[in-house]
UniProtKB/Swiss-Prot annotation:
The gene is aroA. Keywords: Amino-acid biosynthesis, Aromatic amino acid biosynthesis, Cytoplasm, Transferase. Transmembrane segments: none annotated. The active site is at residue 313. This is 3-phosphoshikimate 1-carboxyvinyltransferase. Pathway: Metabolic intermediate biosynthesis; chorismate biosynthesis; chorismate from D-erythrose 4-phosphate and phosphoenolpyruvate: step 6/7. InterPro entries: Enolpyruvate_Tfrase_dom, Enolpyruvate_Tfrase_sf, EPSP_synthase, EPSP_synthase_CS, RNA3'P_cycl/enolpyr_Trfase_a/b. Catalyzes the transfer of the enolpyruvyl moiety of phosphoenolpyruvate (PEP) to the 5-hydroxyl of shikimate-3-phosphate (S3P) to produce enolpyruvyl shikimate-3-phosphate and inorganic phosphate. Its EC number is 2.5.1.19. NCBIfam families: aroA. Phosphoenolpyruvate binds at residues 22, 96, 124, 171, 344, 386, 411. It comes from Salmonella agona (strain SL483).
Amino acid sequence: MESLTLQPIARVDGAINLPGSKSVSNRALLLAALACGKTVLMNLLDSDDVRHMLNALSALGINYTLSADRTRCDITGNGGALHAPGALELFLGNAGTAMRPLAAALCLGQNEIVLTGEPRMKERPIGHLVDSLRQGGANIDYLEQENYPPLRLRGGFTGGDIEVDGSVSSQFLTALLMTAPLAPEDTIIRVKGELVSKPYIDITLNLMKTFGVEIANHHYQQFVVKGGQKYHSPGRYLVEGDASSASYFLAAGAIKGGTVKVTGIGRKSMQGDIRFADVLEKMGATITWGDDFIACTRGELHAIDMDMNHIPDAAMTIATTALFAKGTTTLRNIYNWRVKETDRLFAMATELRKVGAEVEEGHDYIRITPPAKLQHADIGTYNDHRMAMCFSLVALSDTPVTILDPKCTAKTFPDYFEQLARMSTPA
């Protein structure tokens, strides 16, 4: 297996313009495909997940052109639901941001489409979304294991009164919200359980509004969507920088700054993961906000005990930042780590122990006490981009760290290690 050993880093300084947000990129691509008119998407993320969405849209007859660096996409919308030319199978890798929204959108009209993916995708639950779509008339079969992909979709979604479980993944609600305006009937969506990752729903609502559709949101417990609507292209749309990707650089600034400045997000960003900067501030770093940037300056870091449900992806970065904080850090209400690219609670606990930390892994929390001195270890990444990027921070000590399968960062940030090296001064 390929590996990358990062030597100790004495200081991290400088600015980075962030690649586009994965969450925003794939939502914007799907809405542009469903919309009337031509959309120009700028700062689109060039990554595995986005390629899977683009390949799927192409197979569904959507025409687009990409710039040489794949960050500008000119896409001609279908002006309504997507239709397969015949029976079709779409391979979506491990891209949850493609699988969930497409599973809903392709239930409009009459299609026969199979959605499948990598082995890990077949372990990521989708039953709650399928249950909700069936309530709205969709005809869906499981082809292997009940409640998991692959799925066969045969259209039939008309809207109506629908319940969705919000406790596992906000992507299920996102998928329903984006599909409902194109259904022939009005849709009322009621959310059962505690809605996880609520800020991601705000991204969805914000983007739908950009494409000309507004819906009634009653305290995130009930959403009323008028049927028979159309999305309309906003013309040009700039994809924000990825706030989850910003977390590694901001944390590096907190641990070994200098000052690190990330551009492409700022105080006006629609992504909830910008709140990661508040957590670093609480730990002792100095944060400066601009409209289009966030800067972090080193501080003496101390442990925190916090509910992280609002920033589940960026919270992983706090788990490795905790190795540099005084005291025991506890991250709570993070059960949905278990249904991501890998079981991230198990993976994080396992790899933190390798570098010498004392770790308690709970059902929905993790407690981390740093060692007096970090140990060199080979870090398993579980084909999870965030594991690789989180554990790169171990090199901000006087100990090297070896990252196995470093190219897994291609899911969201293909040149992550080059960018980190560019801003680093070796010890």
